Amino acid sequence: MKTHTITKDQLDDQNRYVGEADLTSFSGHIEISADLGFVKFASKLVATGRIRAYSGSGIEAGEGIEAGWGIKAGSGIEAGEGIEAGWGIEAGLGIKAGEGIKAGEGIEAGLGIKAGLGIEAGLGIKAGLGIEAGL
């Protein structure tokens, strides 16, 4: 499976992704290099494989974030809509979604987990601070 790695040269001065690859429906893995801060995506971020942001990098999408495998970020994960992974979702800081959060395996955050709708995991849900869901 191919991997697209996001580096600093693919970001504008507001840390928005401006690279040439279409990451709204990517066939493969998406990786975000370390120490980039929160990398912002105007709409959704979708990969058939995993989505991973290394230490010091986080993911922020205007719409949803979806991975066929797992989603993991050294910092936080935030989506205007839902977050869904076939495997687990893990963030060094918080996980926040305007709608639901769903993982085939576990959901884990160093701080809080918050969803506008429900939170569902095939295995456990763990947060260093609170867990909050609208429904």
Predicted regions and their residues:
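Charge-rich, low-hydrophobicity low-complexity segments
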Residues: M1-G92, K96-A109, K114-A115, E120-A121, ...
